[in-house]
Amino acid sequence: MINIPPELLTNARMHYTYLHEHPELSFAEEQTAAYIRRILDRLQIQYTDAGPTGIIGFLPGRDTSRTIALRADFDALPISEKEDHPLISRKPGIMHACGHDLHTAVLLGTAEILATRSLPFNLMFIFQHGEEVLPGGARDIIGNVFFQTHLPEWIIALHAEPDLPVGQLGICPGQYMASGDEISITLHGPGGHAALPDQSADLILIASHIVVALQQITSRNASPFLPTVLTFGHFRCHSMMNIIPKEVRLEGTFRTFDETWRQEAKTRIRRITTAIAESMGAQPAIEITDGYPCLYNQPEKAEQAIGILKTEFGEKQVIRLGRRMTTEDFARYSQLLPATFIRLGVSSTTHPAGKLHTPEFFPDLAALETGIRTLCSLILNND
């Protein structure tokens, strides 16, 4: 069992406090990056910048031909935090509602423990920006020359999970998180008076037909054995009750696990939308932005991690998870090299963490110790 010195846990809480109180939005995390650099300087860990604010720390090992990477993201979300939390964001309208402050504090704590160790391989500490918005900061890390010349044989990340109790970890070998693409459909027509629909194209009606028709993609075109989600969450037009608008915009998301079906479905979305719009007198403009791919936990590495962590924490503290339809840009690493994405329990009976991406989210900080022990055990038990 790995014991974390009390003074190191104090430092990890200090890191968390600073990061939580000073959240920054994706691709604009200047203060956060500066803070991480100061800590790495204090620990005498060399680093290089990657992208606008990403950082790759590096600890040389005895065998310099091998590298293992640990990754934490550090961007925040445009959400106003609930005011009764023990710590509060100092930036109105911005908060760490997805646990990225916790991820970074855990990785900094792990770096502090391992900085003085002689490891049999190089250890890379990836502090990544811009996870929350496309195209995601992982692209900047992967495209970095230093990363390419020290390509890891294994990359590991943790993510806060409010549905798991503190002290418990979850892993799903194989496909874990769905791919996700952004859909934007804009319909144009002549517009007109609501009392004279015969003299215009009713874009609201047309858009409604499109939303309903596209659901056949999930109910009739997708295999019943292949999880697929197509949801439109934004229906916008600037109009009023007695006006047929000239423009209507739909925005939604498409998610699945199979790359061939992913591409086929996007073709169907374009074809169905165009056919309905044009047959009803509208001109469609369709934009589908490729999002993150499917996150894949390489089974052999996932099983290795499960074995190590059960030894560290006990059989009942490491559970196997099912697939989920949310997305994560750690998936980009998983498409390139063996990867393991681990869920870190952050709730307790006395401290319900709230849901991710909500103003109520605030983790039980006892998870800091679990997270640091998790990463350290995976590194120190890997020859």
Question: Language-model features: where?
Answer:
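Acidic/His- and Gly-rich active-site-bordering loop/insert found
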Residues: 2-96, 101, 105, 109-120
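Divalent metal-coordination and catalytic microenvironments
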Residues: 19, 57, 70, 100, ...
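Histidine/acidic-residue-rich, glycine-tolerant segments that coordinate divalent metal ions
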Residues: 77-79, 84-95, 101-102, 117-245, ...
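General structural feature for long, well-ordered alpha-helical segments within catalytic domains
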Residues: 8-15, 28-39, 66, 94, ...
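Non-cysteine beta-strand/loop elements that form the S-adenosyl-L-methionine
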Residues: 69-71, 80, 183-185, 339-347
